[in-house]
């Protein structure tokens, strides 16, 4: 699948696909150490820092 980048909105970190707006459901950004992880259902996709 495509890569996602993290974006902050309303004091919360969220993942959004490139060239598209942030989505509220299905995708979440979980900060881990120095990197962020994009989680979609049971799949995990790595993304840039938040």
From Swiss-Prot:
The keyword Zinc does not apply. Disulfide bonds join 7-15, 39-47. GO terms for molecular function: DNA binding. GO terms for biological process: chromosome condensation; sperm DNA condensation. Testis. Keywords: Chromosome, Developmental protein, Differentiation, Disulfide bond, DNA condensation, DNA-binding, Nucleosome core, Nucleus, Spermatogenesis. It comes from the Eukaryota. GO terms for cellular component: nucleosome; nucleus. It is found in: Nucleus; Chromosome. The keyword Nucleus applies. Signal peptide: none annotated. Its main location: nucleus. InterPro entries: Protamine_P1. Protamines substitute for histones in the chromatin of sperm during the haploid phase of spermatogenesis. They compact sperm DNA into a highly condensed, stable and inactive complex. Cross-linked by interchain disulfide bonds around the DNA-helix. Belongs to the protamine P1 family. This is Sperm protamine P1. It comes from Sus scrofa (Pig).
């Amino acid at each position: 699948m495509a890569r996602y980048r993290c974006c902050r909105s309303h004091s919360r970190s969220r993942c959004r696909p490139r060239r598209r707006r942030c989505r509220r459901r299905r995708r979440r950004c979980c900060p881990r150490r120095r990197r962020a992880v994009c989680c979609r259902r049971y799949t995990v996709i790595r993304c840039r820092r938040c």
